[in-house]
Amino acid sequence: MKNNIVLRRGVEADLPQVLSLIQELAVYERAPDAVTNTLAAMQRDGFGPAPIFSFFVLENAAAEIIGLALFYTAYSTWKGRMLYLEDLVVTEAARRGGFGRLLFDAVVAEARATGAVRLKWQVLDWNEPAIGFYRKLGAIIETEWLNGNLDTTQLAEYAVAPAATMAAAPETGSSL
């Protein structure tokens, strides 16, 4: 690998450094207090009985993780199986060394290996370096779709209609 950098699939022991990189990304994205995820939640969600994400890391000779690509399987009703790239981050000191490309290539290879028909991700509209990076790789950066979100408080306060509660119950063979 480049400059004694190793690209590998992430393991549970990487999570403290991964969470640190995620926090570094939040600072870069002007949202330093937005990360509420915890190490325990990442251990449960990535390495529990039903893992919901995977990741690749770049590790230097000092065993420091300098890059991360975290992704998960998603589904497009229009296209089918896809991978969603949640975070692609290289620590600031290692940027512009080709490491983002190594991580992105690994995710593309994973998408191909798992039969995904699409790889999707988000990029902030002001993050020109990232937009340029993705465009250089041949990606189309969409402008017509807006994202909707409900945060933890909104989810808790949302008034669920009785029919929706029934729909979320185990299947009984009846339809709504």
Name every feature range the model reports, one short phrase each.
Residues 157-163:
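Short, charged, solvent-exposed linker or helix-capping segments at domain edges/interfaces
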Residues 114, 136-137:
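Structural motif
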Residues 5, 9-13, 20-81, 104-105, ...:
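Acetyl-CoA-dependent GNAT
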Residues 121-130, 149-153:
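Conserved beta-strand-loop-alpha-helix junction that forms the acyl-donor binding cleft
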Residues 96-109, 136:
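Conserved acetyl-CoA-binding loop-helix of GNAT-fold acetyltransferases
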